[in-house]
C-alpha cells in the first residue's frame, strides 16, 4: 500500500564557486559572504538569504555529497523518488557539481555527485545482500536501469541512442512525455540500459556525456548548450520487514508450520538534472546557432521560474501551475510539487560582475524552498495488497480479542456495542490502583508506627533498668535491637500466616478439581536422556522431600512455641498486640511468599503440564492475600493462628504425598531402564562370544591347513598365492563396499532434503505458471480495455472537433449578424434621437452641460466592432471627431424606448447610477494607474542602475587591462635598464593613479549594488499592495470602464513609443551621416598632412606620436563595435578610434577587404584614378573565399533598414550617402563621363535621393493599408513605405531641401486613386563580376506603386498583382505594360493565366475575378470563396479599400490551375474549393487541414486525374488525388510526415520530387512516389522561405526569403549552388517560363533573371559569388 503522503519541502543548497583566474586578473571583487556555522549567505552588504545548506568558495565535492545527497540514495532503497538539479547562470559550476561533463583525467576528490551516487548505490546493494545472507534471509534482488536525456532546443534527445544522427539535432524527436494515473511522469521511446555494476553505469554516463551538446562562449569555454537529465531506476524485491507485533501474530498463526517469507517490490527513480545556464547574449557574444540555443535555454528556464513562482508563492498556489509551457518543466513535474524528495543546488558566482544573475538565482532558490512535495513509497500492487491485508488482519485480531475478552458484544438486534463488564473492569482497575496507593501509604504508616513502638518499648525497658540501677548504654542498645527484631519477626509471622491460609484454600480447591497431576508423563522414560539425568532428578526430588519434612517439623515446633508465647504475651502486652500481630503477620507473609515461590519453582520444574492452573492459583492467591491482610487487621485471636498453622501443615503433608508419588514413579522408570540396559548388555556379550568363537574357528582352520604335510611345497605356495589374491580382491571389494555404504548413507541423508527442495521448486513453478496465465489474461483484458477506451476517446474527440467547428461557424455567423444589427441599431437610435430633438428641442446651454458632463466622465466604450470602426474614423478623419462626439454622447445617455410607461423614471435611475459608478471607477482607475506608473518607474530605475553597473564594470575592465599593460612594460624596462630609469617611476605613478581609479569604481559598483538591493526590496514590499482586491471588487460596468482606459493608455503609450523610436532612428541616421562626413574630412585632412609630412620630419614625428597615443586606447563601446562588422563603424568606435581610420588611409594597417564589399572605399575616394586597381584587387581577394559567400552579414553593418536604404549595388555606383550631395554628384558625373558606366535605373537614383530626404518621409509613414492589410496578406512582411511614382525622373532633380508635394498627396490618399501610369521593363545595368554569378538580372519591371505580391508568366506575357489593388499585364517582347486589370477590393494576392482559354484569374479578399484579355480588360465572372458565381463584377470598384470580408466568406490565399486548364483550385480558409471551368461551377472541396491553406500546387498524374499538394499554417503538407467528375468533399490520400515547425509558404514539384518552404526558415525535399522525406535543410535561409521555383533548363531549385536573398540548390543532391541578394525587401513570389526567372518583391519591382554559368546544377566557374551578391 502506498504510504500516506508526507509533505516534504524542496531543500535548497547554495554553492558559491571560486573566482576564476580571469576574474581575478580583471579585478572583480567578491560580493558574497557566508555566515560561519549558519546556512546563510549575504549578497552585497546586508542582503541576507537563508537556505537549507550553504557551501562557500572552499567547499569540496565530498562535503556537498555527504550533507545533501547521501540521504536521498538511502531513501531510494525504501522506495522514495529523489531529484537533484543544479540551477544557475552559465559558468557557475553546475556541470562540475553534478559530474555530467565527463573528464578522463579527473581526480577522485573532484568527482561529481552522479559518480559518487553511483558508487554509493552499488555499495549499498552489496551490503544489503550480504546482510540478508548473514541473517539467514533470501538476499534481495535489485534491477538497476539508466536513462540519459538531453533537452536541446525544446527537443528531447536520447543520449543512449546509438542509431540517431548526431548532426540532425534540430530534427523532431519521437520521444513522448506522458503522465500515469498517480501523477507520475514517464517517457516513451527512450533507450533504457540495464546495468549490474558500477563500471557499467560509469561507462553509460561517459557515453552519454560525450554525446552531449557543448560549445564555447565568451563566458564559458565549455558551455552546456542543453539541459541533461540522467535518471536511475531502482527496482528492489526484498523480504517484507515485520514489526514485533506482527511477528508475535505470525508466530501464533503459523506456530505448527514452517515460516514463509513474504516479499515486497519497491521502485524508485533518481533524477540528476544538469540545467544549462541562463545567458545574456551581450555577455556570451553568442550568434547564429549559439544565440538560438541561448534563447531556447532561457525560454526553458523562464518556464521553470514560472513553475517555481506558481508553486512557491503562497498567494499563487491555488492558480494553475504551467508545467506544459516547456518540456523541461513537464519532465520535472513530479520533482516540483509531486512525489519526490528534491534538492535544488543553486550555483552562483561570487564576482560582482555577475551580481544581477546571482541575485536572481538566489531569489528563485529562496522561492523554491516554499514548494511542498508529496512524498510516498512506490510499491507494486502485490506489496500494497499484502500490507493492506496485514493491517486488516491486525485489525480483525484486535477485534476478535475484544470479542473474546467481552469488551465487544452483539445484542439481540445485531447491534455492536461495548460490554458493561469492560467499563466495570476499567473502574475496578482504577479502584485497584487507588487501593494499591493506599496500601503503600498504610505500609509506610505501619513502618513508622513500628519504629515508634520499638522506641517506646526500649525506652520503657531502659527506665525499668534505670530504676533497678542496672542501666547501661550497651544494654539499652541491645534491648532496642532485640525489640526491633522481635517486631520484624512478628510482622513476618503474621504475613506468613495469611499467605499459608490462602495457599491452603487454593490447594483445597486444586485437589478438589484434579487430585492427581498425572505428572508421570512428564518424567516418562522417553524424555529422560540418560541414567545420570534420571538419578539426578530422583536425588533432587528426595532432597525436596527431606526439606518438606524438616519444614513440617519446624512448623510443629513453631506452633508449640507460639502457643506458649501467646499465653505470656496476653498477660504482658495488652492492647499493643494488635499492631504487633499485624506486623508479624506481614513479616510472616513475606517469608511464606518466598517459601511459596521456591515451592512453585520446584513444582514448575517437576510439573510442566499445569502452568495455566498455577497462574490461576497465583491470581487467587493475590486476591486471598488482600483478604488475608484485611482479616489479619480484624482478627488477632490465637485460634486463627493455629488454624493457619494446621492448614499449612496439611498443605505440606499433601505436597509430601504428591512428591512421594513422583519419586516412586521415577524409581519405577529407573528400574525399567536398568532392566532394558541389562538385557542389551547380555545380548552384546552374546554377540561378542559368537565373534570370539568365529575367530577361534578361523585360527583352527589355518592351523589345520599349516599342519597338513601331504601337500607339496609348490602346491602350498600356489594355494597361498591364490588365497592372498582372493584376500586382496576381497579387501578391495570390502573397501569399495564401505565407500559405497558411506555414499549411500550420505545420499539417504540428503535425499529427504532434495525431495523437500524438489517439491518446493515444483510448487513455485506451478505458482509461476498460474501467475503467468493470470497475468497474460489480465494483459489481454487491459489491452482490450485500452483499445476500446482509445477508440471511444477518438470518437469523442472527433465529435467534439466537429461540434467545435460547428460552434465556431455559428459564432462567426452570430458575430456578423450582431455587427449588422449594431449598425442598424445605431442608425435607428440616431434617427430616434434626431426625431426627439425635433419634437422636444433642448437649449444649447443645457445640451452643452450634458455634453460636458458625459465627456468628462468618460462614457463607457461601445462594442468592439463599433470601437474599431470609430478608431478608424478617428485616425482617418480627425477633423470630424469633435462633430461626432455630441450625438454619440446623447445616444449613450438616452436609453432606448421601452414598452412600459416608465421611461423617464428608468432614465433618471440609470443616469444617476452611471454617474456614481463612473466616479468609483475613476478612483479605481487612478489607483491602478498610479500602481502601473510606480512599477514602470521601478523597472526603469533598476534598468538604469544595471546599465550604470555594466558601464562601471567595463570601465574597471579597461583600467585593469591598462594597468596590466603598464605592469608588463615596467617589467620589460626593469629587465632592460634597471629600476633607476625615470620611466619606471612614471609608470609606477600612473599605475597608482589607475589603482585609485579602480578602487573608486569598485566603491561605485558596491553603492550601485546596494541601491539595486534596496530597489528589489522596495519592489517586493510594493508588490504586496492589494491591487487584485481592487480589480475583484469591480462591477461589470466598472471593469469595462477600466478596460477601456487600459486600452486607451496602451494605445497612447504605443504611439509615444513609436514616435520616440522614429525620432531616435532619424537622429541616429543624422548622427551616422555626420560621423561619416567627419571621418571622411578627418581622413582627407590627415592625407593632406601626410603629404606635407614627407617634406617636414617634425610633422611626420608628430603624426606618428599621435598614432601611438591613440593606438593604446580601445574603443569605449566594445560590444557595439564587435557586433557591427562592416565598412561603417559604430558611433562609439567612430569618434574614439580615429587612429585606425588614419592608419588605414596611410597604409600602416592593411584593411581586411571582405569578398562581399562593393562600396567605394576611402582610398578610392581619395585616389579616383586608382579605383579600378582597388576594385580589381578586392575582387582578386574575394575570389579566395570560396564559392558561397554569406549574404546576411551585409545586413549587419550597423545601419537600420529604414536608415540605410541604399543597397550594395547602389553603393558601388554612387558615392557614400554620408557625403554631401555635391560630392556625390561630382563623383557620379565623373564616373559616368570617364568610365561610361551605364546609367542606373530611376529606382536606383531615387533610393539615393530618398535616403537624404528621410526625415520628411518619416512624417508620411502612415498608409491606408493598415494592420488589416498585413493580416490579410499571405506572408506578413515588414511594412513598406508607399511612394508615388508620378514623375520618377523629375523627382531626381528636385533640390534636397524641398519636399515633394506629390509624395505627400500619395501618402494621404490611396495609391489607386492617383493617375494610373504605364509600367515599363528596363534593362538592368551589368556590373563587374557577373561572370561568376549563377543567375544574372537582365531586366527590371517597374510600374506598381506598392509591393508586388504575385506573378505569373508565359513566354510572351507577364502578369503581376500588387498591394495597389491592380493586376498588370506586360508584353515581354516590347517591354511595355499593355493593360491594367481594374481596381480590386484589396490586395491582389494571386494571379494565374490559362493558355488554352486566354483567361486571367485574379484573387482579392474572398473573390476570384475572371478576365478575358483577348479584346479588352473585361471581367466576365466573379467567383466567391463560398462557391457562388456572379456574371460580371460582383464587387464594384470602390475608391476606398475594402477590408471587411462578407459573412459566410473567407480569405482566399492562393489559386492554381490544372495543366489542362479545365479545373481551378482555390485555397480559402482551411479547405480548397474545386471549380469546373467548363461550366464555372463549384464541384466540391478538399478538406483535412486544421489551419488556413497558404499555398498549393497542381500536377497531372494521368489523363483526367489531378494531383494536388497543399500546405497550411498547421505545419502539415497533404496530398489529394482528384479524378475528373469528383464531387463533394475529398479527403487527403496522404499526410507528409514529419511536419515543418511553422506554416508552409511555398511548394514546387519537379518530377517525383516535391519541395516545400516554410516560415521555420527550412526547405524539405519529399519523394512523391514513396511518400516520404528525402532530405531537409533546417536553416536554409535566415528568414521565412516565401517562394520556390525551378530554374528553366537546369536541375536547380531557386528559393527566395523574406530577407530578399535568393539561393540555388541542386535538385538531386540538395547541395547549395549559390546565393545572392535578389531584392532589398522581402521576396513574395517566383515564377518561370521557358527561358527566364521572375521574382516579385516588396520594393514594387519584378526582376527578370537568366541562368548563367550553370551546368547540370553546378557552377561552371569556381569564382566567388560575392561579386554578384554585391552587384545585385
Swiss-Prot record:
The UniProt entry's GO biological process terms, in alphabetical order, are: anterograde axonal transport; cortical microtubule organization; regulation of axon guidance; regulation of microtubule depolymerization; regulation of microtubule polymerization
Q: In which tissues is it expressed?
A: Widely expressed, with highest expression in brain.
A Pfam family of this chain: Kinesin
Q: Which residues form the signal peptide?
A: none
**Disulfide bond entries:** none
Task: List every position bearing Phosphoserine.
Answer: 258, 524, 1227, 1231, 1241, 1660, 1671
| Gene3D superfamilies documented for this protein | Kinesin motor domain, YVTN repeat-like/Quinoprotein amine dehydrogenase
List, in alphabetical order, the Gene Ontology terms for molecular function in this entry. Answer: ankyrin repeat binding; ATP binding; microtubule binding; plus-end-directed microtubule motor activity
Q: Which residues carry this modification: N-acetylmethionine?
A: 1
**Which family does the similarity line name?**
Belongs to the TRAFAC class myosin-kinesin ATPase superfamily. Kinesin family.
Name of the protein this chain belongs to: Kinesin-like protein KIF21A
**Name of the encoding gene:** Kif21a
Amino acid at each position: 500500500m502506498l504510504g500516506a503522503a508526507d509533505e516534504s519541502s524542496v531543500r535548497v543548497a547554495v554553492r558559491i564557486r571560486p573566482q576564476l583566474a580571469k576574474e581575478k586578473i580583471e579585478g572583480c571583487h567578491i560580493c558574497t559572504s557566508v555566515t560561519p556555522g549558519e546556512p546563510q549567505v549575504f549578497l552585497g552588504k546586508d542582503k541576507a538569504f537563508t537556505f537549507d545548506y550553504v557551501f562557500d568558495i572552499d567547499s569540496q565535492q565530498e562535503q556537498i555529497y555527504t550533507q545533501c545527497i547521501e540521504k536521498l540514495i538511502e531513501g531510494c532503497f525504501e522506495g522514495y523518488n529523489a531529484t537533484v538539479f543544479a540551477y544557475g547562470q552559465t559558468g557557475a559550476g553546475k556541470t562540475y557539481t553534478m559530474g555530467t561533463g565527463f573528464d578522463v583525467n579527473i581526480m577522485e576528490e573532484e568527482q561529481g555527485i552522479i559518480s559518487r551516487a553511483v558508487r554509493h548505490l552499488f555499495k549499498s546493494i552489496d551490503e544489503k545482500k550480504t546482510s540478508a545472507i548473514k541473517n539467514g534471509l533470501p538476499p534481495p534482488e535489485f534491477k538497476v536501469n539508466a536513462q540519459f536525456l538531453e533537452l536541446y532546443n525544446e527537443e528531447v534527445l536520447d543520449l543512449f541512442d546509438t542509431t540517431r544522427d548526431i548532426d540532425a539535432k534540430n530534427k523532431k524527436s519521437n520521444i513522448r512525455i506522458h503522465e500515469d494515473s498517480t501523477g507520475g511522469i514517464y517517457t516513451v521511446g527512450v533507450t533504457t540500459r540495464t546495468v549490474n555494476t558500477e563500471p557499467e553505469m560509469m561507462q553509460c554516463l561517459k557515453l552519454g556525456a560525450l554525446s552531449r551538446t557543448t560549445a564555447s562562449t565568451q563566458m564559458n569555454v565549455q558551455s552546456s548548450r542543453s539541459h541533461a537529465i540522467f535518471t536511475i531506476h531502482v527496482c528492489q524485491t526484498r523480504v517484507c520487514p515485520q514489526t514485533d507485533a506482527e511477528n508475535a501474530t505470525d508466530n501464533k498463526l503459523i506456530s505448527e508450520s514452517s515460516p514463509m517469507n513474504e516479499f515486497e517490490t519497491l521502485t524508485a527513480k533518481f533524477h540528476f538534472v544538469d540545467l544549462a545556464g541562463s545567458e545574456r547574449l551581450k555577455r556570451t557574444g553568442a550568434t547564429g546557432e549559439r544565440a538560438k540555443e541561448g534563447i531556447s535555454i532561457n525560454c526553458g528556464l523562464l518556464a521553470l521560474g514560472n513553475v517555481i513562482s506558481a508553486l512557491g508563492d503562497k498567494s499563487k498556489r491555488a492558480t494553475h501551475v504551467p508545467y506544459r509551457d516547456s518540456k523541461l518543466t513537464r519532465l520535472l513535474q513530479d520533482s516540483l510539487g509531486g512525489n519526490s524528495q528534491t534538492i535544488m543546488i543553486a550555483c552562483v558566482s561570487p564576482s560582482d560582475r555577475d551580481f544581477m544573475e546571482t541575485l536572481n538565482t538566489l531569489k528563485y532558490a529562496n522561492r523554491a524552498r516554499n514548494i511542498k512535495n508529496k512524498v510516498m513509497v512506490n510499491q507494486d500492487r502485490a506489496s500494497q495488497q499484502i500490507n493492506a491485508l496485514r493491517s486488516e488482519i491486525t485489525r480483525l485480531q484486535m477485534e476478535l480479542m475484544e470479542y473474546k475478552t467481552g469488551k465487544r458484544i452483539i445484542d439481540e438486534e445485531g447491534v455492536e456495542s461495548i460490554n458493561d463488564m469492560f467499563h466495570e473492569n476499567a473502574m475496578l482497575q482504577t479502584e485497584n490502583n487507588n487501593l494499591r496507593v493506599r496500601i503503600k501509604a498504610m505500609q509506610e504508616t505501619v513502618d513508622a508506627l513500628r519504629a515508634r513502638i520499638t522506641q517506646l518499648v526500649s525506652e520503657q525497658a531502659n527506665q525499668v533498668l534505670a530504676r533497678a540501677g542496672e542501666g547501661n548504654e550497651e544494654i539499652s542498645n541491645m534491648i532496642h535491637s532485640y525489640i526491633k527484631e522481635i517486631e520484624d519477626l512478628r510482622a513476618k509471622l503474621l504475613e506468613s500466616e495469611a499467605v499459608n491460609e490462602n495457599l491452603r484454600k487454593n490447594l483445597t480447591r486444586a485437589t478438589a478439581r484434579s487430585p492427581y497431576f498425572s505428572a508421570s508423563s512428564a518424567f516418562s522414560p522417553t524424555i529422560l536422556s540418560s541414567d545420570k539425568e534420571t538419578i539426578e532428578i530422583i536425588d533432587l526430588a528426595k532432597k525436596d522431600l527431606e526439606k518438606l519434612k524438616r519444614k513440617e517439623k519446624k512448623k510443629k515446633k513453631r506452633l508449640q512455641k507460639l502457643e506458649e508465647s501467646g499465653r505470656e504475651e496476653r498477660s504482658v502486652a495488652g492492647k499493643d498486640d494488635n499492631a504487633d500481630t499485624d506486623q508479624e503477620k506481614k513479616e510472616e507473609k513475606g517469608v511464606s511468599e518466598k517459601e511459596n515461590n521456591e515451592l512453585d519453582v520446584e513444582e514448575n520444574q517437576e510439573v510442566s503440564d499445569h502452568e495455566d492452573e498455577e497462574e490461576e492459583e497465583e491470581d487467587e492467591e493475590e486476591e486471598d492475600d488482600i483478604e488475608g491482610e484485611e482479616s489479619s487487621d480484624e482478627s488477632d485471636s490465637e485460634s486463627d493462628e493455629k488454624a493457619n498453622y494446621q492448614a499449612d501443615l496439611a498443605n505440606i503433608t499433601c505436597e509430601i504425598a504428591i512428591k512421594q508419588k513422583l519419586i516412586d514413579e521415577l524409581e519405577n522408570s529407573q528400574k525399567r531402564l536398568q532392566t532394558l540396559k541389562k538385557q542389551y548388555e547380555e545380548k552384546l556379550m552374546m554377540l561378542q562370544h559368537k565373534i570370539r568363537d568365529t575367530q577361534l574357528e578361523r585360527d583352527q582352520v589355518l592351523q589345520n591347513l599349516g599342519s597338513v604335510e601331504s601337500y607339496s611345497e609348490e602346491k602350498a605356495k600356489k594355494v597361498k598365492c591364490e588365497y592372498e589374491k582372493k584376500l586382496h580382491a576381497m579387501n578391495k571389494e570390502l573397501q569399495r563396499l564401505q565407500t559405497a555404504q558411506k555414499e549411500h548413507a550420505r545420499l539417504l541423508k540428503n535425499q529427504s532434503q532434495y525431495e523437500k527442495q524438489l517439491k518446493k521448486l515444483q510448487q513455485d513453478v506451478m505458482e509461476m505458471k498460474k501467475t503467468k496465465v493470470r497475468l497474460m489474461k489480465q494483459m489481454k483484458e487491459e489491452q482490450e480495455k485500452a483499445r476500446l477506451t482509445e477508440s471511444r476517446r477518438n470518437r469523442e474527440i472527433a465529435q467534439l472537433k466537429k461540434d467545435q467547428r460547428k460552434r465556431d461557424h455559428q459564432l462567426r455567423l452570430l458575430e456578423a449578424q450582431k455587427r449588422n444589427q449594431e449598425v442598424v441599431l445605431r442608425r435607428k437610435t440616431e434617427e430616434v434621437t434626431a426625431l426627439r430633438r425635433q419634437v422636444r428641442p433642448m437649449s444649447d446651454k443645457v445640451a452643452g452641460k450634458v455634453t460636458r458632463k458625459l465627456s468628462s466622465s468618460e462614457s463607457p466604450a461601445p462594442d468592439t466592432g463599433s470601437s474599431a470602426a470609430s478608431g478608424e474614423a478617428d485616425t482617418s478623419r480627425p477633423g470630424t471627431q469633435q462633430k461626432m462626439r455630441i450625438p454619440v454622447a446623447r445616444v449613450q445617455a438616452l436609453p432606448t424606448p421601452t414598452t412600459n410607461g416608465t421611461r423617464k423614471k428608468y432614465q433618471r435611475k440609470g443616469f444617476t447610477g452611471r454617474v456614481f459608478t463612473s466616479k468609483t471607477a475613476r478612483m479605481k482607475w487612478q489607483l491602478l494607474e498610479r500602481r502601473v506608473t510606480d512599477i514602470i518607474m521601478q523597472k526603469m530605475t533598476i534598468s538604469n542602475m544595471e546599465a550604470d553597473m555594466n558601464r562601471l564594470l567595463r570601465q574597471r575592465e579597461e583600467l585593469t587591462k591598462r594597468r596590466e599593460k603598464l605592469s608588463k612594460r615596467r617589467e620589460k624596462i626593469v629587465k632592460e635598464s634597471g629600476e633607476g630609469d625615470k620611466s619606471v617611476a612614471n609608470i609606477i605613478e600612473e599605475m597608482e593613479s589607475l589603482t585609485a581609479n579602480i578602487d573608486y569604481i569598485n566603491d561605485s559598483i558596491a553603492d550601485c549594488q546596494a541601491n539595486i538591493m534596496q530597489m528589489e526590496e522596495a519592489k517586493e514590499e510594493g508588490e504586496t499592495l492589494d491591487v487584485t482586491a481592487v480589480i475583484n471588487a469591480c462591477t461589470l460596468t466598472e471593469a469595462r470602464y477600466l478596460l477601456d482606459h487600459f486600452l486607451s493608455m496602451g494605445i497612447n503609450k504605443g504611439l509615444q513609443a513609436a514616435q520616440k523610436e522614429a525620432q531616435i532612428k532619424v537622429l541616429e541616421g543624422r548622427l551616422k551621416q555626420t560621423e561619416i562626413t567627419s571621418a571622411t574630412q578627418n581622413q582627407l585632412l590627415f592625407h593632406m598632412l601626410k603629404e606635407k609630412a614627407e617634406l617636414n620630419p617634425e610633422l611626420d614625428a608628430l603624426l606618428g606620436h599621435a598614432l601611438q597615443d591613440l593606438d593604446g586606447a580601445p574603443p569605449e563601446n566594445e560590444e557595439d563595435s564587435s557586433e557591427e562588422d562592416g565598412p561603417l563603424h559604430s558611433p562609439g568606435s567612430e569618434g574614439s578610434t580615429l587612429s585606425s581610420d588614419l592608419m588605414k588611409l596611410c597604409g600602416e594597417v592593411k584593411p581586411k577587404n571582405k569578398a562581399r564589399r562593393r562600396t567605394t572605399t576611402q582610398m578610392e575616394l581619395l585616389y579616383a584614378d586608382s579605383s579600378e586597381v582597388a576594385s580589381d584587387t578586392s575582387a582578386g581577394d574575394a575570389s579566395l573565399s570560396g564559392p558561397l559567400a554569406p549574404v546576411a552579414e551585409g545586413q549587419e553593418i550597423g545601419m537600420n533598414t529604414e536608415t540605410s536604404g541604399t543597397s550594395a549595388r547602389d553603393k558601388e555606383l554612387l558615392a557614400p550617402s554620408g557625403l554631401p550631395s555635391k560630392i556625390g554628384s561630382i563623383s557620379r558625373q565623373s564616373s559616368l563621363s570617364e568610365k561610361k558606366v551605364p546609367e542606373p535605373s530611376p529606382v536606383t537614383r531615387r533610393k539615393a535621393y530618398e535616403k537624404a530626404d528621410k526625415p520628411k518621409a518619416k512624417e508620411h509613414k502612415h498608409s491606408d493599408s493598415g494592420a488589416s492589410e498585413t493580416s490579410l496578406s499571405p506572408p506578413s512582411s515588414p511594412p513598406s513605405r508607399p511612394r508615388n511614382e508620378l514623375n520618377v525622373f523629375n523627382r531626381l532633380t528636385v533640390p534636397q531641401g524641398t519636399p515633394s508635394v506629390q509624395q505627400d498627396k500619395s501618402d494621404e490618399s490611396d495609391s489607386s486613386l492617383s493617375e494610373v501610369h504605364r509600367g515599363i521593363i528596363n534593362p538592368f545595368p551589368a556590373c563587374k563580376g557577373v561572370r561568376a554569378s549563377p543567375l544574372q538580372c537582365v531586366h527590371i519591371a517597374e510600374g506598381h506603386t506598392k509591393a508586388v505580391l504575385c506573378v505569373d508568366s508565359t513566354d510572351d506575357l507577364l502578369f503581376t498583382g500588387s498591394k495597389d489593388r491592380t493586376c498588370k499585364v506586360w508584353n515581354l517582347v516590347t517591354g511595355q505594360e499593355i493593360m491594367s486589370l481594374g481596381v480590386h477590393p484589396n490586395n491582389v494576392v494571386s494571379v494565374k493565366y490559362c493558355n488554352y482559354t486566354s483567361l486571367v484569374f485574379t484573387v482579392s479578399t474572398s473573390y476570384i475575378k475572371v478576365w478575358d484579355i483577348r479584346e479588352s480588360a473585361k471581367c466576365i465572372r466573379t467567383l466567391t470563396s463560398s462557391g457562388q458565381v456572379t456574371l460580371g463584377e460582383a464587387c464594384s470598384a470602390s475608391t476606398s479599400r475594402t477590408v471587411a470580408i462578407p459573412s459566410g466568406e473567407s480569405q482566399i490565399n492562393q489559386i492554381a490551375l490544372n495543366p489542362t486548364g479545365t479545373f481551378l483550385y482555390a485555397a480559402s480558409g482551411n479547405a480548397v474549393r474545386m471549380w469546373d471551368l467548363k461550366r464555372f461551377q463549384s464541384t466540391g472541396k478538399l478538406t483535412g487541414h486544421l489551419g488556413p491553406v497558404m499555398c498549393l500546387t497542381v500536377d497531372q498524374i494521368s489523363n483526367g486525374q489531378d494531383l494536388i499538394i497543399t500546405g497550411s499554417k498547421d505545419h502539415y503538407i497533404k496530398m489529394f488525388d482528384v479524378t475528373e467528375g469528383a464531387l463533394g468533399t475529398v479527403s487527403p490520400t496522404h499526410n507528409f510526415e514529419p511536419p515543418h515547425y511553422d506554416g508552409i509558404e511555398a511548394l514546387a514539384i519537379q518530377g517525383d520530387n516535391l519541395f516545400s518552404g516554410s516560415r521555420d526558415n527550412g526547405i524539405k525535399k519529399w519523394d512523391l512516389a514513396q511518400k516520404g522525406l528525402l532530405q531537409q535543410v533546417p536553416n536554409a535561409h535566415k528568414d521565412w522561405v516565401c517562394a520556390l521555383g525551378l530554374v528553366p533548363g537546369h536541375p536547380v531549385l531557386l528559393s527566395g526569403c523574406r530577407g530578399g536573398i535568393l539561393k540555388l540548390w541542386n535538385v538531386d543532391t540538395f547541395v547549395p549552388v549559390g546565393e545572392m541578394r535578389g531584392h532589398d525587401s522581402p521576396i513574395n513570389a517566383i515564377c518561370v517560363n521557358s527561358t527566364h526567372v521572375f521574382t516579385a518583391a516588396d520594393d514594387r519591382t519584378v526582376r527578370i533573371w537568366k541562368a548563367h554559368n550553370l551546368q547540370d546544377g553546378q557552377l561552371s566557374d569556381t569564382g566567388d559569388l560575392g561579386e554578384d551578391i554585391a552587384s545585385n
